[in-house]
Amino acid sequence: MEKIKYLKSIQISQRSVLDLKLLAVGAFTPLDRFMGEEDYRNVVESMRLKSGTLFPIPITLPMEKEIAKDLKEGEWIVLRDPKNVPLAIMRVEEVYKWNLEYEAKNVLGTTDPRHPLVAEMHTWGEYYISGELKVIQLPKYYDFPEYRKTPKQVREEIKSLGLDKIVAFQTRNPMHRVHEELTKRAMEKVGGGLLLHPVVGLTKPGDVDVYTRMRIYKVLYEKYYDKKKTILAFLPLAMRMAGPREALWHGIIRRNYGATHFIVGRDHASPGKDSKGKPFYDPYEAQELFKKYEDEIGIKMVPFEELVYVPELDQYVEINEAKKRNLKYINISGTEIRENFLKQGRKLPEWFTRPEVAEILAETYVPKHKQGFCVWLTGLPCAGKSTIAEILATMLQARGRKVTLLDGDVVRTHLSRGLGFSKEDRITNILRVGFVASEIVKHNGVVICALVSPYRSARNQVRNMMEEGKFIEVFVDAPVEVCEERDVKGLYKKAKEGLIKGFTGVDDPYEPPVAPEVRVDTTKLTPEESALKILEFLKKEGFIKD
């Protein structure tokens, strides 16, 4: 520890902290470091390390150009977490450039910024670094430490229970009766035990918070599973939401924890729908890829179709069987749980979830009309964003909501003082405002943000900071000629004369939203009419009571 004071220090992201931890404990075996260039390119293109071993997801350490260019081969550097705690030292062996489109297209199958990882990748540095790692200390956890188990600890627990077959279950959601049924059926199918292995690291933005989920997993394990055959362990994984490739990766990780079988369900590790409303992955694509490679990775797949509840039988059956037998069935989607039950203060039915789970979820959610949300107005300079924002704020306050208004000009004076107008500084400004907005929303406040925010990927990253449905993107649409006519400050004129550089709409592009929640054409609507249109959307979504 004394020597590290004299070494160069680099802060790494929370994603990289989680990757580092799982590298250190052997969860990513055979990997023991962030990937070098040859491994990286092989994995991206063929899902294999340079040794030929199957490994579908690149595990890399991004670095900003300014930092990467000063690194020297062979030097030792300290890797610190976002709070500046030293976690490991790395001997720099490789510094190499990466390409977002190349990686995203091959690994995720898309470059659509609605994919949460694609949006995040736009903020990574231009380089990856790799080298030998020596751990100083691993991140400490003070929540449910008894369930934060390493691969070695889980393998020892499996051995102590005398289980030669064990099926692992991955989830990032609260568990309900259907998941309980699925896992218990899987145990019977393999004739062994169960590893309940929920992810408590980085999941899909907007998922139910980790503390609520951990409480649910704990109570279900303690009250409804046979402890002689079941192990509960929390996995601090940074998910990529990479669908089929991610399913394979999850299987490799569970093999390293001692599992012999792995449950792969419908839409495994899927981030939902793209900008055009189409699913990123086919529902059973992950099962197909896993089946192809299960023998090679050394863990068998236990596939499941969607299970549905049949009232007349008082049991769950696979949906295809229910259809084949003409059975009447019911199920509740995740969206329906949130919108029709939790946010309305309605109790979830007992056929759907255990009463203890229903109680924990009820404590977490407040009625929809009391929940926080963010209205994000984006558009060209002088399109009318600030005026609409002020009118909308007044309308919401008159209806009893407390509103925070984050206007671009005001933010530049306080929150983002010192930032310029380069693309990097503009993205930083957008993400700063987005972070503040997400914290307000998290605590059930209402925030209206009025910023040019010209870059689609940055806006999508802000969207991903919030629970699904709570980021309302409003495209304040007006052609550049109209905006120029409205410009009382003469900024467009100065930009055209070359007196202002990088001005959006003149010499810097504006990327309009692909699928905004609301579009207001300010050449046809007055500011008041535009604000009313947004208000009507908020009423329709249940954020405002009539």
UniProtKB/Swiss-Prot annotation:
InterPro entries, per the entry: APS_kinase (IPR002891), ATP-Sase_PUA-like_dom (IPR025980), P-loop_NTPase (IPR027417), PUA-like_sf (IPR015947), Rossmann-like_a/b/a_fold (IPR014729), SO4_adenylyltransferase_pro (IPR020792), Sulf_AdTrans/APS_kinase (IPR050512), Sulfurylase_cat_dom (IPR024951)
One Pfam match: ATP-sulfurylase
Record: active site: S453 (phosphoserine intermediate)
Pathway as given in its UniProt record: Sulfur metabolism; hydrogen sulfide biosynthesis; sulfite from sulfate: step 1/3; Sulfur metabolism; hydrogen sulfide biosynthesis; sulfite from sulfate: step 2/3
Residues engaged in binding ATP: G379, L380, P381, C382, A383, G384, K385, S386
CDD domains registered for this protein in UniProt: APSK (cd02027), ATPS (cd00517)
GO biological process entries: hydrogen sulfide biosynthetic process; sulfate assimilation, phosphoadenylyl sulfate reduction by phosphoadenylyl-sulfate reductase (thioredoxin)
Catalytic class of the enzyme: transferase
Family listed: In the N-terminal section; belongs to the sulfate adenylyltransferase family. In the C-terminal section; belongs to the APS kinase family.
Protein name (Swiss-Prot/TrEMBL): Probable bifunctional SAT/APS kinase
Taxonomic lineage: Bacteria, Pseudomonadati, Aquificota, Aquificia, Aquificales
Gene name of this polypeptide: sat/cysC
